[in-house]
Amino acid sequence: MAESVYKIIELVGTSDQSWEKAAAAAVQRASESLRDLRVAEVTQMDLVLENGQVTAYRSKVKVSFKYEGG
């Protein structure tokens, strides 16, 4: 197997429905501009509150992809 190098970036996805959908939104957005995504790791979840009510779910996600730079 050839040696490979992967780059890791950190993103925050949001959803008004769930943490899972927030994480999926982050990965989906990353896939629009990055190739060869490999692993996504949810590292933190939080809520946005307004007047004591949940208005958004946020998932912080580390996404790795194969590094092809020079």
Walk through the language-model features, giving the residues of each.
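Short, well-ordered alpha-helical segments
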Residues: 4-37
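Short connector loops at helix/strand junctions that flank enzyme active sites
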Residues: 6, 37-40, 54-60
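Flexible glycine-/small-residue-rich
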Residues: 13-15, 44, 65-67
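Short, conserved loop-to-beta-strand elements that form functional interface hotspots
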Residues: 40-48
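C-terminal structural segments of small proteins and small subunits
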Residues: 51-70
